[in-house]
From Swiss-Prot:
This is Troponin C, body wall muscle. GO terms for cellular component: myosin II complex. It comes from Halocynthia roretzi. The keyword Repeat applies. Ca(2+) 1 binds at residues 57, 59, 61, 63, 68. Belongs to the troponin C family. SMART domains: EFh. Gene3D superfamilies: EF-hand.
Length: 155
């Protein structure tokens, strides 16, 4: 909870209060969590709901109090941030591919020229091997999908 801003805590308090409006004890049970998940288009099983609660149930009560709710929301925010990282990587891969693919037909000769231009002593057979490994449809070019697949193994 200490990682949250006052504004985030305030927003989470408002959401928490909606969650517990029907609850007699002021905490979120699997029943309340299930209702909200269904409103969000999810259809978790009772087991799924219990596991979600257990992940943040610090005091072992079987329900989620406000502090535990904040922990759950903070973890959700972190997961969303981490999900953005592949988007940035995808954008970088796309930009790199565009830089290599000068004539718009995929990269083949361009890859060889780019590797030669690095100043590294890259042997022709090494470039040929990279092309053979990356060129899944055997058209002597690396298209964008093949490029992305190839780069995943590089990282």
């Amino acid at each position: 909870v200490e990682h949250l801003t006052e504004d985030e805590k305030s927003q989470f308090r408002a959401a928490f209060d909606i969650f517990v409006a029907d609850a007699k004890d002021g905490t979120i049970s699997s029943k309340e969590l299930g209702k909200v998940m269904k409103m969000l288009g999810q259809n978790p099983t009772e087991k799924d709901l219990q596991e979600m609660i257990e992940e943040v149930d610090i005091d072992g009560s079987g329900t989620i109090d406000f502090e535990e709710f904040c922990l759950m929301m903070y973890r959700q925010m972190q997961a969303q941030e981490e999900a953005k990282i592949p988007e940035r990587e995808e954008k970088e891969l796309s930009e790199a591919f565009r830089l290599f693919d000068l004539d718009g037909d995929g990269i083949g000769d361009e890859l060889k020229a780019a590797l030669d231009g690095t100043g590294e002593n890259v042997e022709t057979w090494e470039v040929d091997e990279m092309m053979a490994d990356g060129d899944k449809n055997h058209d002597s070019q690396i298209d964008y999908e093949e490029w992305v697949t190839m780069m995943k193994f590089v990282q």
